[in-house]
Amino acid sequence: SGGFFAAVDLPRQKKQNIEDSVELFYQQTFQFGGGAADPALVRHLVENATEALHWLESLGVRFESDVIGLYGSHWQRVHVPVLPLGTGYIRALSAAALKRGVKICTSADVTDLYFEKGRAAGVVVKIAGKQEIVHASRAVVIASGSFASNNKLVAQHAPHLQGLTTNNIPTTDGELMMAAHRQGVALRDMDAVQCLPGCPPNKKFRVRFHNDVSRHIY
Protein backbone atom coordinates (compact mmCIF):
# COMPACT_ATOMS: atom_id res chain seq x y z
CA SER A 1 0.00 0.00 0.00
CA GLY A 2 1.11 3.55 -0.68
CA GLY A 3 -0.39 4.65 2.61
CA PHE A 4 -2.56 7.44 1.20
CA PHE A 5 -4.79 8.83 3.96
CA ALA A 6 -8.15 10.51 3.28
CA ALA A 7 -9.25 13.05 5.89
CA VAL A 8 -10.76 16.51 6.07
CA ASP A 9 -8.05 18.95 7.16
CA LEU A 10 -9.35 22.45 6.47
CA PRO A 11 -6.22 24.46 7.42
CA ARG A 12 -4.19 22.45 4.92
CA GLN A 13 -6.91 22.34 2.28
CA LYS A 14 -7.67 26.07 2.39
CA LYS A 15 -4.09 26.82 1.35
CA GLN A 16 -5.04 25.14 -1.93
CA ASN A 17 -8.46 26.85 -2.06
CA ILE A 18 -10.25 23.56 -1.44
CA GLU A 19 -13.67 23.62 0.22
CA ASP A 20 -14.53 20.53 2.20
CA SER A 21 -16.53 19.22 5.14
CA VAL A 22 -17.05 16.02 7.09
CA GLU A 23 -20.58 15.79 5.70
CA LEU A 24 -19.32 16.00 2.10
CA PHE A 25 -16.72 13.35 2.94
CA TYR A 26 -19.50 11.11 4.25
CA GLN A 27 -21.79 11.60 1.26
CA GLN A 28 -19.02 10.97 -1.27
CA THR A 29 -17.65 7.91 0.53
CA PHE A 30 -21.09 6.34 0.73
CA GLN A 31 -21.96 7.28 -2.87
CA PHE A 32 -18.72 6.11 -4.47
CA GLY A 33 -19.00 2.84 -2.60
CA GLY A 34 -22.21 2.17 -4.49
CA GLY A 35 -24.28 2.56 -1.32
CA ALA A 36 -23.14 -0.86 -0.15
CA ALA A 37 -21.29 0.28 2.98
CA ASP A 38 -22.72 0.34 6.49
CA PRO A 39 -23.76 4.01 6.99
CA ALA A 40 -22.82 3.90 10.68
CA LEU A 41 -19.31 2.65 9.89
CA VAL A 42 -18.86 5.25 7.15
CA ARG A 43 -19.97 7.95 9.58
CA HIS A 44 -17.51 6.72 12.20
CA LEU A 45 -14.71 6.69 9.61
CA VAL A 46 -15.19 10.22 8.31
CA GLU A 47 -15.85 11.80 11.72
CA ASN A 48 -12.67 10.36 13.22
CA ALA A 49 -10.30 10.54 10.24
CA THR A 50 -9.01 14.04 11.04
CA GLU A 51 -8.21 13.12 14.64
CA ALA A 52 -6.46 9.97 13.44
CA LEU A 53 -4.41 12.00 10.95
CA HIS A 54 -3.23 14.41 13.63
CA TRP A 55 -2.48 11.50 15.98
CA LEU A 56 -0.27 9.91 13.33
CA GLU A 57 1.53 13.21 12.81
CA SER A 58 2.07 13.54 16.57
CA LEU A 59 3.88 10.18 16.47
CA GLY A 60 6.16 11.33 13.67
CA VAL A 61 4.41 10.27 10.47
CA ARG A 62 5.10 13.01 7.91
CA PHE A 63 2.81 13.95 5.04
CA GLU A 64 3.35 16.17 2.01
CA SER A 65 2.10 19.75 2.39
CA ASP A 66 -0.44 19.45 -0.46
CA VAL A 67 -3.42 17.12 -0.57
CA ILE A 68 -4.48 15.34 -3.77
CA GLY A 69 -7.47 13.63 -5.33
CA LEU A 70 -7.29 9.87 -5.69
CA TYR A 71 -9.38 6.95 -6.91
CA GLY A 72 -11.87 6.00 -4.24
CA SER A 73 -11.97 9.53 -2.86
CA HIS A 74 -12.76 11.82 -5.83
CA TRP A 75 -11.95 14.93 -3.81
CA GLN A 76 -8.76 16.69 -2.82
CA ARG A 77 -8.51 15.45 0.75
CA VAL A 78 -5.96 12.66 0.34
CA HIS A 79 -2.76 13.08 2.36
CA VAL A 80 0.40 11.63 0.83
CA PRO A 81 3.08 10.21 3.18
CA VAL A 82 6.60 11.55 2.64
CA LEU A 83 8.07 8.05 2.92
CA PRO A 84 6.81 5.51 0.35
CA LEU A 85 5.00 2.18 0.56
CA GLY A 86 3.85 2.52 4.15
CA THR A 87 7.36 2.76 5.59
CA GLY A 88 6.56 6.05 7.33
CA TYR A 89 3.75 4.41 9.29
CA ILE A 90 5.80 1.34 10.15
CA ARG A 91 8.74 3.35 11.47
CA ALA A 92 6.69 5.79 13.54
CA LEU A 93 4.19 3.31 14.95
CA SER A 94 6.83 0.68 15.70
CA ALA A 95 8.90 3.24 17.58
CA ALA A 96 5.85 4.38 19.56
CA ALA A 97 4.90 0.79 20.41
CA LEU A 98 8.42 -0.17 21.51
CA LYS A 99 8.59 2.95 23.66
CA ARG A 100 5.49 1.70 25.48
CA GLY A 101 6.96 -1.74 26.06
CA VAL A 102 5.12 -3.57 23.30
CA LYS A 103 6.85 -6.71 22.04
CA ILE A 104 7.00 -6.92 18.24
CA CYS A 105 7.72 -10.30 16.65
CA THR A 106 8.92 -10.36 13.05
CA SER A 107 9.50 -13.37 10.78
CA ALA A 108 6.64 -15.02 12.66
CA ASP A 109 4.16 -17.15 10.71
CA VAL A 110 0.70 -16.98 12.30
CA THR A 111 -1.00 -20.20 11.22
CA ASP A 112 -4.24 -20.25 13.20
CA LEU A 113 -6.32 -18.62 15.90
CA TYR A 114 -6.39 -20.03 19.42
CA PHE A 115 -9.80 -20.25 21.09
CA GLU A 116 -10.78 -20.86 24.71
CA LYS A 117 -14.43 -21.38 25.66
CA GLY A 118 -15.58 -20.12 22.28
CA ARG A 119 -13.59 -16.90 22.51
CA ALA A 120 -10.49 -15.88 20.57
CA ALA A 121 -7.73 -15.98 23.16
CA GLY A 122 -4.56 -15.83 21.08
CA VAL A 123 -2.83 -17.06 17.95
CA VAL A 124 -0.87 -20.13 16.93
CA VAL A 125 2.47 -18.94 15.61
CA LYS A 126 5.61 -20.55 14.22
CA ILE A 127 8.88 -18.79 15.02
CA ALA A 128 12.22 -20.24 13.89
CA GLY A 129 10.50 -23.53 13.10
CA LYS A 130 8.95 -23.84 16.55
CA GLN A 131 5.18 -23.66 17.04
CA GLU A 132 3.77 -21.91 20.07
CA ILE A 133 0.65 -20.14 21.29
CA VAL A 134 0.76 -16.42 21.95
CA HIS A 135 -1.99 -15.49 24.41
CA ALA A 136 -3.92 -12.25 24.02
CA SER A 137 -4.45 -10.04 27.05
CA ARG A 138 -7.77 -8.58 25.90
CA ALA A 139 -8.54 -9.25 22.23
CA VAL A 140 -7.22 -10.58 18.94
CA VAL A 141 -7.20 -8.14 16.03
CA ILE A 142 -6.95 -9.79 12.62
CA ALA A 143 -5.03 -7.46 10.30
CA SER A 144 -3.58 -10.08 7.98
CA GLY A 145 -4.62 -8.57 4.67
CA SER A 146 -6.99 -9.78 2.00
CA PHE A 147 -7.35 -13.02 0.07
CA ALA A 148 -6.43 -11.56 -3.33
CA SER A 149 -3.61 -14.07 -3.87
CA ASN A 150 -5.87 -17.04 -3.18
CA ASN A 151 -7.44 -17.95 -6.53
CA LYS A 152 -9.80 -20.43 -4.90
CA LEU A 153 -11.29 -17.84 -2.54
CA VAL A 154 -11.51 -15.22 -5.29
CA ALA A 155 -13.42 -17.70 -7.46
CA GLN A 156 -15.71 -18.53 -4.54
CA HIS A 157 -16.55 -15.01 -3.37
CA ALA A 158 -15.99 -12.90 -6.50
CA PRO A 159 -16.42 -15.30 -9.43
CA HIS A 160 -16.57 -12.41 -11.92
CA LEU A 161 -12.90 -11.76 -11.12
CA GLN A 162 -11.77 -15.36 -11.44
CA GLY A 163 -8.56 -15.72 -13.44
CA LEU A 164 -7.31 -12.17 -13.01
CA THR A 165 -3.65 -11.81 -12.14
CA THR A 166 -2.60 -10.09 -8.94
CA ASN A 167 0.31 -8.01 -7.70
CA ASN A 168 -0.40 -8.87 -4.07
CA ILE A 169 2.20 -10.70 -2.02
CA PRO A 170 1.64 -14.48 -1.63
CA THR A 171 0.69 -14.15 2.04
CA THR A 172 -2.54 -12.33 1.17
CA ASP A 173 -4.22 -15.72 1.10
CA GLY A 174 -7.09 -15.21 3.57
CA GLU A 175 -5.76 -17.96 5.83
CA LEU A 176 -6.58 -16.27 9.13
CA MET A 177 -9.88 -14.96 7.79
CA MET A 178 -10.92 -18.53 7.04
CA ALA A 179 -9.59 -19.74 10.40
CA ALA A 180 -11.86 -17.23 12.13
CA HIS A 181 -14.79 -18.24 9.93
CA ARG A 182 -14.36 -21.90 10.89
CA GLN A 183 -14.80 -20.83 14.51
CA GLY A 184 -18.09 -19.09 13.72
CA VAL A 185 -16.87 -15.55 13.01
CA ALA A 186 -19.20 -13.88 10.50
CA LEU A 187 -17.74 -12.52 7.27
CA ARG A 188 -19.33 -9.86 5.07
CA ASP A 189 -18.71 -8.00 1.80
CA MET A 190 -16.41 -10.75 0.58
CA ASP A 191 -17.28 -9.92 -3.03
CA ALA A 192 -15.92 -6.37 -2.66
CA VAL A 193 -12.46 -6.88 -4.16
CA GLN A 194 -10.57 -3.79 -5.30
CA CYS A 195 -9.11 -3.96 -8.80
CA LEU A 196 -6.79 -1.58 -10.63
CA PRO A 197 -5.97 -1.47 -14.36
CA GLY A 198 -3.11 -3.77 -15.21
CA CYS A 199 -1.37 -5.84 -17.81
CA PRO A 200 -3.29 -8.72 -19.48
CA PRO A 201 -2.21 -12.25 -18.44
CA ASN A 202 1.09 -13.43 -19.95
CA LYS A 203 1.93 -9.96 -21.29
CA LYS A 204 5.05 -8.03 -20.34
CA PHE A 205 4.16 -4.41 -21.00
CA ARG A 206 3.48 -2.17 -18.03
CA VAL A 207 0.28 -0.30 -17.29
CA ARG A 208 0.82 2.56 -14.86
CA PHE A 209 -2.09 3.88 -12.81
CA HIS A 210 -1.12 7.46 -12.04
CA ASN A 211 -2.34 9.27 -8.93
CA ASP A 212 -1.32 12.79 -9.94
CA VAL A 213 -4.34 14.17 -11.78
CA SER A 214 -2.56 17.48 -12.41
CA ARG A 215 -0.21 15.77 -14.90
CA HIS A 216 -1.94 12.56 -15.97
CA ILE A 217 -5.34 11.21 -17.00
CA TYR A 218 -6.84 8.42 -14.95
Residues covered by each model-derived region:
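FAD cofactor-binding and catalytic pocket of flavoenzymes
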Residues: 14, 199-218
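Core beta-strand elements of the Rossmann-like FAD/NAD(P) dinucleotide-binding domain
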Residues: 105, 127-139
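Short beta-strand segments that buttress and anchor functional surface loops
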Residues: 122-126
